Amino acid sequence: MKNFVMFLTISRLISGPIIFFLANIFEQYLIAFVIFLLSAVTDFFDGFLARRYQAESSLGKVLDPIADKIILVCALVSINLLIDSIYIGFLSIIIISREIWVSGLREHNSQMGKTSKTSVSLLAKYKTATQFFSIALYYYSFAYNLALGFFIAGFILFLSAILSIKTALDYTKNTFQEN
């Protein structure tokens, strides 16, 4: 089971660049959508299976959040290049900056033996869900040229940026709070 869980994580690591190339070089938006959707689903399953079958590994714990960030950054850069929008670019900068900041906080807290200060919150899970839903909707909208889909995806990405700011502030407060 450990090998299967690691396979899922590694498949997510390589899916980000594949999604980017499919969408931006080959204009295969529907295939990019499907691979992105599969990556989002495997993000849930690799952690679930690892915990359920005691197949967690220290390498998996390191690679899993890296895979999340690679997929997110590749997809947001891809969408920015396809849309060429300052608005989407600005939201993407907020989202990516938050991911880097919180990763730094988590590393700091890990070194201090205080990992609970930045354990994943429910709000952060909603943030991730809105990011993934928005990105999937963008690729689906590209595939079928859905103007309403682009509008809704942009609004959901805006909500995701707000959640990114809120969770970054929460984690920052938790990290630097005395106790």
Model-based region annotation:
Residues 2, 13, 21, 34, ...:
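A feature for the membrane-embedded catalytic helix bundles of lipid/isoprenoid biosynthetic enzymes
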Residues 1-7, 58-64, 119:
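Short, amphipathic, aromatic/basic-enriched membrane-interface segments that mark the entry/exit
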Residues 22-28:
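Membrane-interface transmembrane helices that cradle and orient dolichyl/undecaprenyl
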Residues 26, 54-55:
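Membrane-interface helix caps and helix-loop-helix hairpins in membrane proteins
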Residues 8, 15-19:
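N-terminal signal-anchor transmembrane alpha helix
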